[in-house]
């Protein structure tokens, strides 16, 4: 069904109420590779029983963490087949460290919808607040919908992420476990693209790929561990664009540049001619 811009743009979804526990946080951070050295206190700080420190990227998944069915893309004025949708970008901003357990209310609205001709880019913003109205985090997301352009909307900006023209200040090896996608799917993303070899083959991939949000969260953790002394509370904002795929079992490289107070990065796959997996990575310290 074509996108109905008059209905979709500015539409606000019904509020979603949800809660999470320290066990959810532990599982999420295990899914990102926390605990790779079970004797390292810094790794164990992500997995403490009642008070794990919480990476801000947990805010990107908290509202859907307990879903056990594949997601749908059906919203006011928007009805798109999941197989046509690619995750384009993600960002989270936190005014204060996230608690290891709690309850929240999330409200999502569609902020921009761009007509790229053969595709559409749909941008949304979600605010999560405590039951008494305190802002916990703001999440911004864009998706790329193949075959959904041509509805008469504005083309919008062209995203371009150019890494600094100098050698990175730091390079971090980021190994992906062979079973990492199977573990991360327990964090609320049951898209079979990440677990079913036949589904992945039908989508054009040689094997299931890693969730983009897993690579996204792993990269945040890698930068926090390398440059912020493994202190998840030192992050005020973090975001990235999804430029390519990652496969379980490979090792990625995180290239990090210091840019004033910001840390900017890209993620590449060295065994695939440095194919770019994430671009425009930005971490803003608190």
UniProtKB/Swiss-Prot annotation:
Name of the protein described by the UniProt record? Enoyl-CoA hydratase ChsH3
Name the job this protein performs. Answer: Degradation of the cholesterol side chain involves 3 multistep beta-oxidation cycles, this is involved in the second cycle. Hydrates bulky steroid enoyl-CoA esters, has highest activity with 3-OCDO-CoA (3-oxochol-4,22-dien-24-oyl-CoA) making (22S)-HOCO-CoA, followed by octenoyl-CoA, with weaker activity on 3-OCDS-CoA (3-oxocholest-4,24-dien-26-oyl-CoA) and none on 3-OPDC-CoA (3-oxo-pregna-4,17-diene-20- carboxyl-CoA). Hydrates the same substrate as EchA19, but the 2 enzymes make different stereoisomers of the product.
Q: Which reaction does it catalyse?
A: (22E)-3-oxochola-4,22-dien-24-oyl-CoA + H2O = (22S)-hydroxy-3-oxo-chol-4-ene-24-oyl-CoA
- Determine if Lyase is one of this entry's keywords: yes
Q: Which CDD domains match?
A: HDE_HSD (cd03448)
List the signal peptide residues. Answer: none
Q: Where is the active site?
A: 189, 194
**Principal EC category:** lyase
Which cellular component terms (GO) are annotated to the entry? plasma membrane
Instruction: Pinpoint the MaoC-like domain residues.
Output: 163-271
The family database entries (Pfam families) matched by this protein are listed as: MaoC_dehydratas, MFE-2_hydrat-2_N
State the organism's lineage.
Bacteria, Bacillati, Actinomycetota, Actinomycetes, Mycobacteriales
Q: Which gene encodes it?
A: chsH3
Q: Which Gene3D superfamilies does the entry mention?
A: Hotdog Thioesterase
């Amino acid at each position: 069904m074509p996108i109905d811009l008059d209905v979709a743009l500015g539409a606000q979804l019904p509020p979603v109420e949800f809660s999470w526990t320290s066990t959810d946080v532990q599982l999420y951070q295990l899914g990102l590779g926390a605990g790779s050295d079970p004797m390292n206190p810094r790794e164990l700080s992500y997995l403490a029983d009642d008070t794990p420190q919480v990476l801000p990227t947990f805010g990107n998944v908290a509202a859907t963490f307990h879903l056990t069915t594949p997601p749908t893309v059906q919203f006011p004025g928007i009805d798109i087949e999941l197989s046509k949708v690619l995750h384009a970008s993600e960002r989270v901003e936190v005014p204060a460290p996230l608690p290891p357990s709690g309850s929240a209310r999330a409200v999502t609205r569609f902020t921009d919808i761009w007509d790229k001709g053969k595709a559409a880019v749909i941008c949304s913003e979600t605010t999560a607040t405590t039951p008494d109205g305190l802002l916990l985090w703001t999440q911004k997301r864009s998706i790329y919908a193949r075959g959904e352009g041509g509805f008469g909307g504005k083309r919008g900006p062209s995203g371009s992420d150019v890494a600094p023209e100098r050698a990175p200040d730091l390079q971090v090896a980021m190994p992906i476990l062979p079973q990492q996608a199977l573990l991360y799917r327990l964090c609320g993303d049951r898209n079979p693209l990440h677990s079913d070899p036949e589904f992945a083959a039908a989508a054009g991939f040689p094997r299931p790929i890693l969730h983009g949000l897993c690579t996204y969260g792993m990269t945040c953790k890698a930068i926090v561990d390398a440059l912020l002394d493994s202190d998840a509370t030192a992050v005020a904002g973090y975001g990235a664009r999804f430029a390519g795929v990652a496969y379980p079992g490979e090792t990625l490289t995180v290239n990090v540049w210091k840019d004033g107070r910001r840390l900017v990065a890209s993620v590449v796959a060295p065994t695939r001619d440095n194919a770019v997996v994430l671009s425009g990575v930005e971490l803003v310290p608190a």
